[in-house]
Amino acid sequence: MKREERRLSLAAGLVASSLALTVPAFAEGEVVFSSWGGSFQDALRSAMLAPAASTLNITVKEDTTNGIQDVRAQITAGAVAWDVTEQDLPSCETLSREGSLEPIDYSIVDTTGIPKELIHENYIGFINFTKVIAYRKDTFGDNGPSNWAEFWDLENFPGKRGMHGKVNYNLEAALMADGVPMQEVYDTLATDEGIARAWDKLGKIAPEVTVWYRGGSQSAQLLRDGEVDVIHMGHNRVESVIASGIDVAYAFDGGTMDIDCLLVPKGSPNKENAMRLINELLGAEAQARLSVTMPLGPVNTGAFDTGIISDEMAVKVNTHPTNYDKQLLVDPNFYIGQLGELTEEFDTLIQQ
């Protein structure tokens, strides 16, 4: 796409999202924030973005992202439209190594309550989320696929499958389906034989997958509309489907827990406001409000001390002590340096 066409495309995207604006009465300046859309971004708006806009007295414009390729496209085109974007941790580290990010200004961004391992020169942890196996009870009753071996077992658990259309999480799921204990997944993937084993197992279910979804809002729509019967998707999205009245079951067992981070693309037009917004989004109360609105795991450990998260709600949060050890914590180091190669092989596999 020519540079001018790309600029127009990006501008059109922002116009399309102009309904998602948070504008204080006498706003001074603006910032453009992009995330994953759908009910998740609705929750971000009410719990975090609107309060931040009011506190900072700035206009917060919103857009949606489909991942690392969107950030790269803006930088390559010389048309950076986003000031802050949420991305998965491997993408954050990859973009950082590519020199595509502005450094985080820690004279503005307060890291109190944020684990040290989530504080990076060019990005910072934002939320913990888990992709779980969720199934419609009108198809399976109370006995749907509840682990990865059963997800792969179409003979005993027939039904339309949905999986994430990115390599992330799928190789891990394939190994667990093949009998590798959760705690040994990344040791197995550290070997050529282990990666080959994962590709082989993934290749067995790939032709049976009805939809390889691209975004979180799409996954919720697929489950809600019955276009899939069982799907690997974000547990927060599953909760939104349940809240809409659809009878769906899921569990954290064998879920893949990951961390999203916040970053500022190099060339951000509103860099100072970007840092100020990040600081607001990482505050303990903002993080707690999001967990109440949508049961995502806060990265700020102070969130559980605010009194905002009730005991009843806390057990639905993936980082709650009763849930944490049931899940596989995704290791970004497996992807860093080989994400492009793995993505290319994955895309070839699912397009066959």
Model-derived features: where do they sit?
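Sec/Tat signal peptide C-region and signal peptidase I cleavage site
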Residues: 22-27
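Early extracytoplasmic/lumenal segment of secretory-pathway proteins
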Residues: 28-94, 220
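Extracytoplasmic ligand-binding site segments that recognize negatively charged/polar headgroups
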Residues: 38-43, 81-82, 86-220
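A ligand-binding cleft/hinge motif common to bilobed small-molecule-binding domains
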Residues: 92-94, 230-247
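Periplasmic-binding protein-like
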Residues: 111-114, 129-131, 200-205, 242-268
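A bilobed periplasmic-binding-protein/Venus flytrap-type ligand-binding module shared by bacterial periplasmic
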Residues: 132-139, 175-177, 259-271, 289, ...
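Mature extracytoplasmic/periplasmic domains
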Residues: 265-326
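Conserved C-terminal helix/tail region of periplasmic/extracytoplasmic solute-binding proteins
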Residues: 322-352
